[in-house]
Amino acid sequence: MTEALHIVCPHCHTTNRVAAEHLASAPDCGKCHQPLFTGHPLALDAASFERHIGRSQVPVLVDFWAPWCGPCRMMAPAFEHAAGLLEPQVRLAKVNTEDEQQLAARFNIRSIPTLALFVNGREVARQAGAFRSAQDIVGWVRSHL
């Protein structure tokens, strides 16, 4: 029997069931017919955060950042590139801590950027401070999976 994973659509936020062996074949959402993986980080607000973290069975790496943060801006291209390298095994997302202050407080974000890796809805790893390259991000994620 084939294992089916729950994957939340980055466009309409519908939860989809996808056979694990079909992850690499660019599956589309059953509702909106858009790609389930875009190769780019998702911008999450509080509602979409709950849906993606709580319902997705694919690990989610979240970058808690702020627009005024120099190290956040420095790491942004590496994080973008890492999304293309890690999907579909890991979804990458960003939370603007200026816009989502309650979410940042809930996760006790004290310095930015902070990366948090969630697996099956639970935080399994955290890194405060910027990574210099996409390869550093990928290596850190893989070391925690």
Specify the residue positions occupied by each region the protein language model found.
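Cys/His-rich microdomains that often coordinate metals
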Residues: H13-N16, L36, A76
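Short linker/helix segments within small regulatory modules
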Residues: V18-P27
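Non-catalytic, surface beta->alpha helical segment in thiol-disulfide oxidoreductase systems
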Residues: S111, A116-L145
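A short beta-strand-turn-helix
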Residues: T15, P41-V60
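Short pre-active-site segment immediately N-terminal to redox-active cysteine/selenocysteine motifs
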Residues: Q57, F64-W68, S111
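Short Cys/His-rich micro-motifs in 6-15 aa windows
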Residues: C32-P41
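Thiol-based oxidoreductase modules, predominantly thioredoxin-like and allied folds used
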Residues: L44, F64, A76-A83, E87-Q102, ...
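Short cysteine-rich clusters marking metal-coordination/redox-active sites
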Residues: C9-C12, C29-C32
